[in-house]
Amino acid sequence: MKPTKAGIRKRLAATAAVLSVSAALLVSAPGTGSAATTATPSLRAFGLTGDGTLMATFTTDRPNVLDWVRAVTGLSGDTRLLAIDHRVQNGLMYGLGEKGGLYTIKTPPQTTDVVVTKVSQLQVPLYGTNFGFDFNPAADRLRIVSDNGQNLRHNLNDHTTVEDTTLTTPPLTGPARGVTASGYTNNDLVAATGTVLYGIDTTTDNLVLQAPANNGTLSTVGSLGFDAQPNAGLDLFSQLTNGKTTSVVGFASLTPYGASTPTLYSINLFTGEPTAIDRFPLNITSLAITLTGS
């Protein structure tokens, strides 16, 4: 069903209400240009290297310290992973292969190495170099976007892939070529909270909203404030109370031009302003924060 404008406004309003709590806790008021003194939350996260062959784990307050680094094993029909994310419906971590394979991921201490198992295959070929990859928690669908404007929606339950409308940034016409990271808000199973899709456009160096997601319509939230290299990562962590999202925190892996490795940033979801936390010791370009933070 195509979402109505009223429905979209309702979801955006709900997200704004949740984000206002996050802003009070973690960032300064929009327009002040300074970060609050509140410490970065220590959340367990996983990262994928830019070549898609290694995974690591770290906490969001110390991205400079990798607790382990392991090779990705078990790929079938793919040679590397492009991106990773957690699925709210079952708590599992998934990865996307460069040929469109979709995998569940097991990590230490459950296994010695990072072991992936193929569970599905995109029915539409990937088109692009760098990709955003995130689960819609409300619809239980995978959203995959690319720096060529590709906009896919995949159902892991019946293995179907829908090719949604190409990404655009009105009033400009033609594909929006630059969105290389994506993240949905409100990772819970409460229908009333809804969800909104954010993205990072490394061509315009902006944080953007994709709404409606199926229509591929992009609007600018705010500037990152520097020139970022194309391969980026974005993930949004939802703090839950009684199973419902009460705050949302954004994190991004971004590599300023001239830097040798990415830096982990917290992202102000109202303004797009990034605040550097620390630099990764490896080329970590895709992020997946655990659903519980531990």
Where are these regions (language model features)?
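Secretory targeting and sorting signals
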Residues: 1-35
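An edge-strand/N-cap motif at the start of beta-rich repeat modules
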Residues: 38-61
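Conserved beta-propeller blade signature
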Residues: 44-48, 92-95, 141-144, 191, ...
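A short beta-strand motif characteristic of beta-propeller blades
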Residues: 65-76, 114-124, 161-173, 217-226, ...
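A mid-sequence, solvent-exposed acidic-amphipathic segment
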Residues: 179, 183-235
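N-terminal carbohydrate-binding/catalytic regions of secreted carbohydrate-active enzymes
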Residues: 53-101, 105
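Repeated scaffold domains used in trafficking and secretory/extracellular systems
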Residues: 76-89, 121-138, 169-187, 227-239, ...
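Structural motif
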Residues: 52-58, 101-106, 113, 148-155, ...
